Amino acid sequence: MFKNIVLVGLISCVLLSIKSQQAEVLPELKISANHRFFQADGKPFFWMGDTGWLLFSKLNREDAEKYLEIRRKQGFNVIQVMVLHSLSETDFYGDSALNNRNIANPKIADANYPNNYWNNIDWVLKKAEEKGIYIALVPVWGSVVKSAHINQNQAKTYATFLANRYKSYSNVIWMNGGDIPGSDSIKVWNTIGNTIHAIDPNHLITFHPRGRTESSIWFHNEPWLSFNSIQSGHRNYSQDTSKNDLRYGEDNWRYIQNDYNKTPIKPTLDAEPSYEKIPYGLHDITLPRWTDADVRRYGYWSVFAGACGYTYGNNDVMQMHNPKDKGSAYGSKDYWYTSINDPGAQQMVYLEKLMLSRPYFERVPAQSLIAANQGQRYNRLIATRGKDYAFIYTYTGRNMDINTGQLPGKKIKASWYNPRNGETTIIGTFNKLKTAKFNPPGQPANGNDWVLILDAI
């Protein structure tokens, strides 16, 4: 009898262990049937990303798990991380990523050796997987390729190593490039993209471009590119003067609009807008800094224009600024473990919740809903809709005239959605008119942002 009890107990433990391991495997991310969005197990997947560029190189395992857990609780489901920021890259424990700074010769070790650079990446990936978080891996930062003159053979060897090592992980996304124009070393970028795609065809791949550009400029028709990324960047309207850029200023919705109209259809998102608490234009730390209101604006503007998600960033968190740093970049003043709870980070989940609150895959940009005066710059109104609903975003809380007659049904239920706290205030239900006027709560001002929700009845 005792032996039977022990045997049953052992079997139960094994089954629980298997079940636990299976629960850690995340569903494969795929492109939706209409090629506009992501899906996981056929369900909508809204990319709610955070920028954790130096996670692998600057945090120990305890802090890495702390970071991931906080972001999980805040609703983030993707973290963008550099694999190699430089050829001299080391991790928190001092272990080098490469032998002799040779990208074609990674310094690997037995899987049981805890302080190996690559073993630590493995560990972080597994922890993220347990928490339901996908990791967008940037194989090598753009400046490394440009300055070190990495050739195609080295790139292929390195990409082969990465793809083989991480193709079995359920939570990997590939983010080729790294703050660089695709035209700079384009053969290397195509080599990395093609190599990873050939070995690991089941994981999505994109390209992280230079500020004020979009991956579609160079790679839209490449078979390895699953979806587009833009970097609307960190400059304000007055700073966007470069002749070589698209010069959209802060209007990140324009980049999304460009990608949305391209064929073949591919999803697109803003993978690097202005970071919370980073100076306007990055480099002059005496200038004002972007706030939570700004990161909300970039999020709602881009998503309502047709993006499949959005990546948030924070100046202190993206560089994992901590007391051991000899200095900081871009005037970072606070430590990552404090800034991780900044207002903008806590407000991002309300964007995700709103987008998933209505039928998702049918959603399209819908500027024709705005009857008059779509507005310029901060006064721009951005509209999106499904078959029976519509969302219209105002950053300044200004009055709006809406073509409610475009929605089906005889009645319209109207509500205000607050992007700062996720609360919904019902305006009322009324007989459908051709056009209707709406006046958001509060006085018009930058950051008094609201979403008008219209539901057809």
Question: Model-predicted segments: where are they?
Answer:
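Bacterial Sec-dependent N-terminal signal peptides
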Residues: 1-23
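Non-catalytic accessory regions flanking glycosidase/transglycosidase catalytic cores in CAZymes
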Residues: 21-74, 386, 402-427, 431, ...
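Short, electropositive alpha-helical surface patch
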Residues: 135-136, 155-162, 287-290, 327-330, ...
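Short, flexible, glycine/charge-rich loop motifs used to bind or transfer phosphoryl groups or to couple energy/partner
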Residues: 18, 69, 162-165, 195, ...
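Catalytic-core region of carbohydrate-active enzymes that cleave or remodel glycosidic bonds
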Residues: 201, 222-322
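Active-site mouth of glycoside hydrolases
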Residues: 26-239, 243, 250-251
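Aromatic- and carboxylate-lined catalytic core of secreted/periplasmic carbohydrate-active enzymes
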Residues: 264-268, 275-279, 291-428, 441-457
